[in-house]
Each structure stands twice: as C-alpha cells, then as structure tokens.
Design a protein with these regions (language model features):
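Cell-envelope/extracellular polymer assembly enzymes that use nucleotide-activated donors
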Residues: 2-4, 34, 179
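Acceptor/aglycone-binding surface of glycosyltransferases and processive sugar-polymer synthases
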Residues: 57, 61-80, 85-87, 97-174, ...
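Short beta-strand/loop segment that forms part of the nucleotide-sugar
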Residues: 31-41
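Short hydrophobic beta-strand elements that form part
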Residues: 4-8, 36-37, 60
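Short, acidic, metal-binding catalytic loop of nucleotide-sugar glycosyltransferases
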Residues: 21-32
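Hydrophobic helical membrane-anchoring modules
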Residues: 171-290
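Active-site beta-to-alpha loop of glycosyltransferases that engages the nucleotide-sugar donor
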Residues: 7-21, 41
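A conserved acidic beta->alpha catalytic loop
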Residues: 39-47, 93
Length: 290
C-alpha cells in the first residue's frame, strides 16, 4: 500500500517544517509513505524549506493557480507515481498530522472511499459565531446536493482512495473541498468522517479575503457540481413553472374572448408566449444536459 501525503503551499516557509515534522513515517498497513509538496507560486523560501526537510516530491507553479489547481496537480502527480491513497493536508499546520492514520484506517479496511476530518467547528475558538453558522450552513447545502450527512464539508484534511480520485473531476478554480463531495455523493461513493481537534491558528486564510467572498465562491462551486449530476431538478422545475405561468395569460385571454372582450388583451398573449418559449427551451436544455 503506497500513500502520498500532499501539502499545497503558498508562502508557508515558516510553518511547513512543523507540518513535515509531525507527519507519521510509520503507519500500520502502509508499505510506502511519500510526501509531496505543491508550491503554488510561493515568493518566500517554501521550496527551500521543503528540500531542507528531505521532501523528494515537489510540484511547482510559476505563479499562483489557486487551491483547486494545486490539489488537482498534486493528485495527478501522486497517481502517476503509483499512489493507492492520497492524503491532503495544509501547509499552515492547522491540522493534526498525527491523525493521518485515523483518516487512512477506513480506506485501508475497505470501508470507505473518502475520509474527511471533522474539525468540530463549533468548538474552534478563533471562529466567530457568524463563521460557525456559515460553516454549518455550507455543510448543509453540500449534504443536500450530495445526498450525504457530513458534519464538516469544508475541511481540507482528508484521504482519498485511488479509485475515488480516478472518478472525480475537479473543474472549479476556487476550492476542491465541496465540489469533490458533491461529485462523490452523486457517484454513490462511501464517505466517512473522523473527528479531530485543529491546531492553534498560525495566520489568516489566504483562500478568500472575507467570509462573503467565500460564501459566494463556495455556493457557485456547489451549484455547478450539482448541475453536473442532477440538471433535471432545476431545469425541470424551471420548465414546469414557466409553462404554468405561460398558460395563465392564454386562459385569461380565452375567458375575455368568450365574453366578447378579446380586444386589448394582446399583451397577455405576448407574455404567455414568452413564458412558454422559455419553458420549451428549459425542457430542451434538460434533455441535452441529461
């Protein structure tokens, strides 16, 4: 069993050595453990720090590409080098690397395809009450779109089996976290959760500038992933809703026509026609998308 622990980094020179030092080198059931650092256009000594700590596998971006691209490039590299399982953590040392064996256990036992660490966000001291609620809301949206019951969908500390990674297709440029869950849930993969306690905060998030930007980008990623697998739900609703709305003006026109008052109600026909055309277009898109 060959496991790759991949660490996406952007200017993590100060904290990367702590992350590398805390990664267990001997894990029951694992024959080979490799460490991969993805340098996402760092301008500090991140790569130098990785090499000084003996990291043999490094993927470098000449400019910052974002977390999703770093994750995808790391996965491609790990799979090309024979990884059976890929563990993703972070270069800021927010996650307890000593819990990596607990993430691997359900996969090694054949019980899960993906294992996600539950940070228990309600108990994280530096999270504001608003942020905790938004984390809970985001996880709820992901669970609704994926058909899962995960307590912490935004956690980046997770393990993927080779089989699961070969079936996932990350298309967003923001964050892979929620998108891969929506895809995995709709592909009926087995996903488990493991409770952890995060390490003390070392820096502000570089993934987004404020919580509202994070909400917008996360929401967009969730909707896009949902549409990839269940386009019939929103498009079907749109087709039915606009079709019904479109029929109402026609019925109204017919009522006036039978009463001999059809003049002056052409606007109803125009509006109704527009709605029915929209309904037909939605139905056509549904067929194509499905």
């Amino acid at each position: 069993m060959k496991v790759f622990v991949q660490i996406p980094c952007f200017n993590e020179e100060a904290t990367l050595p702590m992350v590398l030092e805390s990664i267990p080198r001997a894990i029951e059931g694992v024959d080979e453990l490799e460490i991969l650092v993805i340098d996402d256009g760092s301008t500090d000594g991140t790569v130098r720090a990785a090499r000084a700590c003996g990291v043999a596998h490094i993927v470098r971006h000449t400019r910052n590409q974002g977390l999703a691209r770093s994750f995808r490039d790391g996965v491609d590299y790990a799979l090309a080098h024979g990884a059976d399982v890929v563990v993703n953590t972070d270069g800021d040392n927010q996650y307890p690397q000593e819990r990596i064996p607990d993430l691997l256990a359900p996969i090694l036992r054949g019980r899960a395809d993906i294992v996600i660490a539950d940070r228990q966000t309600r108990d994280i001291a530096h999270f504001s009450r608003f942020k905790k609620r938004m984390q809970s809301l985001g996880s709820g949206m992901v669970n609704l779109a994926a058909g899962t019951r995960l307590p912490d969908a935004a956690s980046g500390f997770r393990a993927y089996s080779r089989r699961s990674l070969l079936r996932l297709n990350v298309v967003t440029r923001f964050s892979y976290c929620m998108e891969t869950i929506v895809q995995a849930g709709n592909l009926r993969m087995r996903i488990e959760s493991v409770k952890i306690r995060t390490n003390p905060k070392t820096r502000e998030s570089r993934l987004f500038s404020n919580i509202f930007q994070h909400m917008y980008k996360s929401g967009k990623a969730i909707v896009r992933s949902f549409l990839m697998y269940k386009p019939h739900i929103p498009l079907g609703f749109l087709a039915v809703a606009t079709g019904i709305v479109g029929l109402v003006p026609f019925l109204r026109f017919l009522v006036f026509w039978f009463q001999g008052e059809s003049g002056g109600h052409v606007q109803s026909l125009i509006f109704g026609t527009a709605m029915i055309v929209t309904s037909l277009l939605s139905a056509g898109l549904l067929v194509v998308a499905d």
